[in-house]
């Protein structure tokens, strides 16, 4: 009888320990997931910034990587990648470096085509067209091969100018992951074609699929903030071995000395 009571007590103790450990793990996971969401929300608050000149007066996260007196540089990047079945992958996008010290903005528009070389290995053929930004207008700084490209560049809009995530907290069934070894973190949501941001992308790009995209928010570095880390977002419409259609965007705040770029 005494042995039976001890056995029962032992089993109850083990179950209690399991419940406590499970509760601690669940609480820690929920807390980290909430922190990941909050980290992304801090970046998504920038959307929309319709006038890019406003970035001259915006300050992002600063750490010891910034030198005294450096106001920092914003890097904005938007690009659309389309690889239809049986065709080459083409990427069109733009990168701007918005220097808060000099209140000047330079960058480039690029067109990249992924083909195979004579040995069947992937080859990335990219052309860059230098631009500057004045009074929220994109201006090519070198002659362009045709008026169509000139118009395409001058009319280009970054996703941060029209994207809006005011309803991000209403997104359902988010898949949140965290890798402490890098560290890296992400959040993935299945969208529908009625989503505002999806409609805006379809309005601006000829997206050759009716399939609704997944929204993937990606980040690396310290969750509390770091000028070394990065955050980006991706709308993935199609992703497989034969076909790829996705849109990527990022807005980064970095020390000005880390923003050297090249255009050809």
Swiss-Prot record:
Keywords: Cell membrane, Membrane, Transmembrane, Transmembrane helix. The lineage of its organism: Bacteria, Bacillati, Bacillota, Bacilli, Bacillales. The chain crosses the membrane at residues 7-27. Coiled coil: none annotated. It comes from Staphylococcus aureus (strain NCTC 8325 / PS 47). It is found in: Cell membrane. Pfam families: DUF576 (PF04507). One of its GO terms (cellular component) is plasma membrane. Belongs to the staphylococcal tandem lipoprotein family. InterPro entries: Csa, Csa_sf. This is Uncharacterized protein SAOUHSC_02783. It is a single-pass membrane protein. It comes from the Bacteria. Disulfide bonds: none annotated.
